[in-house]
Amino acid sequence: MFTPKLVIVTGLSGAGKTQALRSLEDLGFFCVDNLPPALIAKFAELCAQAASRINNIALGVDIRGGEFFNALFQVLSDIDAQGIQYEILFLEASDETLVRRFKESRRPHPLSTHGEILDVIREERNRLRDLRGMANKIIDTSNMEVKQLKEEIAAIFGDSTVASRLHITVVSFGFKYGIPLDSDLVIDVRFLPNPYYQPSLRVLTGNDPAVRDFVFSSPVTEEFMKKFTDLIKFLIPHYIKEGKTTLMIAIGCTGGMHRSVALAGRLGEILREKDFRVTVRHRDINRV
């Protein structure tokens, strides 16, 4: 029977578990925070049986679970016996770092109903010592920024290829209908030869071979396409390094029916050949 990849994210309060779960979610994991340990096996079973297969699961489990958390070791033993494979990611930080983070966030420590903040941090560290010893991967976030933690998570659990970490949407549009509001990059191609003024091409779209041939018959189009794709391929690794997981490239002409459609389609083809995950969408292709 198919079983999904299961990562249990745990560790010290304030060490970055929430950000780790967000990073795993960006990598395509189905994430649930603060799930009672007794439900882990059942949850993994439900995910395995889901109509749309869930390949990767990340569960946040920590001391907030109170008495439920105490059952974690027995639960892990049980799922071992059931053949469910899992990894434990444990996040920690120095006492000084955790004290500073709690003071800056002004949020209470889960154990702060008694004792000073440093005392409860040390108490939690002591309670989690055995779980830390079971961890497959331990990350000390004391000197990490959020971006660095995200990069570390991606290096451990992400796909090995850079291309797979970013989903690119290429959208064609017409300037007369407005620029897509969620665009990251906008390019104006109204300087290219316009098929609209060719009677035989006017009623066609940039998806039709005749229109594409007309648009790309211009040396200017070919030169522009080379320079533009070189720019995109240069930018993508830098966007990924900054932690972007989605990129929308908007290509616009006057009405969004001919030139922008042809170029968006070509750009999508080029990026797919480089193994990038690409969706091509033509926003205004059916507008009159």
Swiss-Prot record:
UniProt KW GTP-binding keyword: yes
User: Which residue spans traverse the membrane?
Assistant: none
User: Which residues does GTP bind?
Assistant: D62, I63, R64, G65
UniProt KW keywords: ATP-binding, GTP-binding, Nucleotide-binding
Please give the Gene3D superfamilies that the UniProt record associates with this protein. P-loop containing nucleotide triphosphate hydrolases
Q: Which InterPro entries match?
A: P-loop_NTPase (IPR027417), RapZ-like (IPR005337), RapZ-like_N (IPR053930), RapZ_C (IPR053931)
Molecular function via GO: ATP binding; GTP binding
Report residues binding ATP. Answer: G11, L12, S13, G14, A15, G16, K17, T18
Task: Check the record and name the Pfam families matching this protein.
Answer: PapZ_C, RapZ-like_N
Family of the protein in this entry: Belongs to the RapZ-like family.
The record's section on HAMAP family has: RapZ_like
Q: What does this protein do?
A: Displays ATPase and GTPase activities.
Q: What is this protein called?
A: Nucleotide-binding protein PTH_2729
